Structures are given as C-alpha cells and as structure tokens.
Amino acid sequence: MDHLPIFCQLRDRDCLIVGGGDVAERKARLLLEAGARLTVNALTFIPQFTVWANEGMLTLVEGPFDETLLDSCWLAIAATDDDTVNQRVSDAAESRRIFCNVVDAPKAASFIMPSIIDRSPLMVAVSSGGTSPVLARLLREKLESLLPQHLGQVARYAGQLRARVKKQFATMGERRRFWEKFFVNDRLAQSLANADEKAVNATTERLFSEPLDHRGEVVLVGAGPGDAGLLTLKGLQQIQQADIVVYDRLVSDDIMNLVRRDADRVFVGKRAGYHCVPQEEINQILLREAQKGKRVVRLKGGDPFIFGRGGEELETLCHAGIPFSVVPGITAASGCSAYSGIPLTHRDYAQSVRLVTGHLKTGGELDWENLAAEKQTLVFYMGLNQAATIQEKLIAFGMQADMPVALVENGTSVKQRVVHGVLTQLGELAQQVESPALIIVGRVVGLRDKLNWFSNYYD
C-alpha cells in the first residue's frame, strides 16, 4: 500500500490553494464543502473565485506565491500551470511538515486527491495512487450507479440511533447484528427517502423490538484456487460478516485481505502428511466458537466438499445442533486447468474427468485399472509425493507411456508455474515442483501449447 487512505477534519482549519484557474477552482470547491477556512494565492483569478470572496467564503491573495501563507496552514494544494511554482509550493510545505497536493504530479506531492462518491455522511474514495486517474474515475462512475442516492439519509439516521443501540445491546456482536438488519431493511430506506416520519418510526421500533438471533453458526466457504477474483460474491459477503475466520494455508493473502478487519483469524494450515492443527482440534474450534454465539467462517482453499474434509467438520456441528451452511468454491481442478490452457473434457480426447486424491490413508489403494482407462482426464490432488507411484501404477495397468501430463504449481496465482511432459517423466517432473500443486494426466494436456492464455513463467 503506497498511500494511507484517511479522511481529514478540515472544518474551520486554514488551508491554502496556490493557483487561480479552473483546476484550482475544482479543488477549492471540495475544500469549501469540507468547511475549510480557505486562502487562495494567484496572479489572476477566474470569476468564480471573486464570487466566493465577495460572499466571504474564502480569502484571495493576488500576486506571486507567498510561502509565509503556509505558516498557519494544515494542508496545501499547488494547482498552477507552472511546474516550477508548484515545486516551490511543495518544497515550502514539506519544510513545514504540511501535507501538500500537487495537481498532476503525484511524485511531487505528499498526498493525492481521490475520486469521491459523496453520500454524506457516507463517503467513498477511490484512488489509483496517482498512476491511473482515468481508471479511478471509471470506478467512481460505476460505484455512483450502484450506491442509492438516499444512502446518506440512512447513514445519517443510523448516527442518530447509535446511543440507543449502545444502551439496548450490551455486546459488540449484538450491535453488529442489529446494524446488519437495519442497513438491509428496504422499507426503512424507502421511508427515509420519502420523508415519511410515521413509517420511519414504526419500522425503527419494530427493528428494536425484534429479538436478535443469539445462536452461533458456521459457514463453510470455498475460497477458490488462489486468484481472489475467483472468490464468489456470496463467499465475499460471508467473510465480510464473520466474527471469526478459521482458514488454511491454501487461502491466498489477497483473499485474507478481504476479510472483515475486526474479525478474529485462526490459522489451521495443513500440509499433506503433516497437520499443523489436527482435524479433530479444528472441529472443536468451530464448535467452541459457534457455541459462544459467534458467526464463524471456515475458509478453505478450493471447494470445501472436494478433498477439503468439509463433510467431516459439518458432521461434528450437526451432532452438536449448530446451524451451518455451505458456500461452494471453484475447485483447484477447474481453476488450475483453465489457467493452464488445459480443458478437462474435449469431444476428441476426454469424455469424463476423475478427481483423485494422491494422499491416501495408510494401506489405502486406488482403482488403478479404471484410472488407466482411455478417453478420460485424471486430476490428482495432493499427489506430488506419490508422483513416481502414480507413474508406475498407471503404466503397469495399461496407460500409454507417452500420455501427456502437467503439474500446476500455485495455480491461478501470479506465481503459477506449469511443467509438462509425458507419463514416463512424471516422477522426475514432480521433483521440479513445490506444493501446492496439481497433477493432470490425459490427452487434453496436449492442447496446452495452443490454448495457454495465462502465463507468468515460460515453462
């Protein structure tokens, strides 16, 4: 993060703008809306500045840049069409430890101005860090269309109720549950928009009188294979409403950055053959936190019901009578194959797909005869340590030695790497790859060179 997003309280505080043209006028309008006590210093001014000055809204200082005007300032903006003057303003502000924005020169500035969606008191700011103002503007326009105009009225009314909510609901969890009901109540929002005081009061009293659900719950959420863009909308909603998130090592940092900031986080990372936290202990963590009345999200890489042991965790909750739900995720087989240019099915090469675990319980054995059959694609999860055995068994049960294979490491992420070859090389190829990785076996792998669209490394 190159810039810390903050909201400044500028009401009745001295601010300076250097420049008297159209750009300076736009910046002045923002500072005036924020209640700043504004001085504008320039050689000449467009008419709007004179109008504001005559109305007593700001002070004009005509002439060259006077750095003594900064002495009482909290914040400054350099908005002239002269780069040399703008740099002088920036240097003078820097020497006084005053934050200064330099229009169209983010590297010379100590702060940048975001694109703003104003639903006061709700404010949304969008910034590209000065690298792409057009992108920030396009995002602002999209958000403008998504956020109702009356949202500010809802936020303002919520502020009026805060003391009552704090008095009536003793815990943070209860208050959060109340506010979640409050902000999704369409009737209340519409009544506020219509200025229907009677309906607003009736809906408010109903919200306060309805009992809150104090029962805890567990939501099993599939985080997908790595790319945060592959997290489902419902999954995103759940991690942003969680009291506590229990997650494993296959959940990417980008996805964890989307988790509600105030949520507790419990890492229970596991590797094939080694459990940082035993599965039974994970089950008990989910049970214990839900019994405290918390909204628990169990966040798993891929899909929780495909080699994620999600069923085992839910059985424990079911036995204890804890409410639960499941949000599916994109499983690694689907995500990694797509990002590697390998279709899992193809009319000419594969009429079926088998998802296989390469990490068996002691003494376990796969149905190698059926796995070696023609016209199918095999995807092995957690198979790196068994790659040589997979190679040996498939060949022994009749699979052709030149069957294409691929190993996908860190699939769908910026660190994705794919190595490929033929079945007789599988054990050797596995030595070049680190976990997490997926093994794909089948004629469809041969299409990779043609269909590969996502590549960060040359294989």
UniProtKB/Swiss-Prot annotation:
UniProt-listed SUPFAM superfamilies: NAD(P)-binding Rossmann-fold domains (SSF51735), Siroheme synthase middle domains-like (SSF75615), Tetrapyrrole methylase (SSF53790)
GO MF entry, a single one: uroporphyrin-III C-methyltransferase activity
- Name the segments for region: Precorrin-2 dehydrogenase /sirohydrochlorin ferrochelatase: 1-204
Q: Which PROSITE patterns match?
A: SUMT_1, SUMT_2
Q: In which pathway does it act?
A: Cofactor biosynthesis; adenosylcobalamin biosynthesis; precorrin-2 from uroporphyrinogen III: step 1/1; Cofactor biosynthesis; adenosylcobalamin biosynthesis; sirohydrochlorin from precorrin-2: step 1/1; Porphyrin-containing compound metabolism; siroheme biosynthesis; precorrin-2 from uroporphyrinogen III: step 1/1; Porphyrin-containing compound metabolism; siroheme biosynthesis; siroheme from sirohydrochlorin: step 1/1
Q: Which GO terms describe its biological process?
A: cobalamin biosynthetic process; methylation; siroheme biosynthetic process
List the Gene3D superfamilies hit by this protein, alphabetically.
Answer: Cobalt-precorrin-4 Transmethylase, Domain 1, Methyltransferase, Cobalt-precorrin-4 Transmethylase, Domain 2, NAD(P)-binding Rossmann-like Domain, Sirohaem synthase, dimerisation domain, Siroheme synthase, domain 2
Q: Which residues carry this modification: Phosphoserine?
A: S128
EC number assigned by the record: 2.1.1.107, 1.3.1.76, 4.99.1.4
The residues the record assigns to binding S-adenosyl-L-methionine are: P225, G301, G302, D303, I306, T331, A332, M382, G411
Region (Uroporphyrinogen-III C-methyltransferase) residue spans: 216-459
Chain sites annotated for binding NAD(+): D22, V23, L43, T44
Family of this protein: In the N-terminal section; belongs to the precorrin-2 dehydrogenase / sirohydrochlorin ferrochelatase family.
UniProt-listed HAMAP family: Siroheme_synth
Name of the protein in question: Siroheme synthase
Species for this entry:
Salmonella agona (strain SL483)
Q: Which gene encodes it?
A: cysG
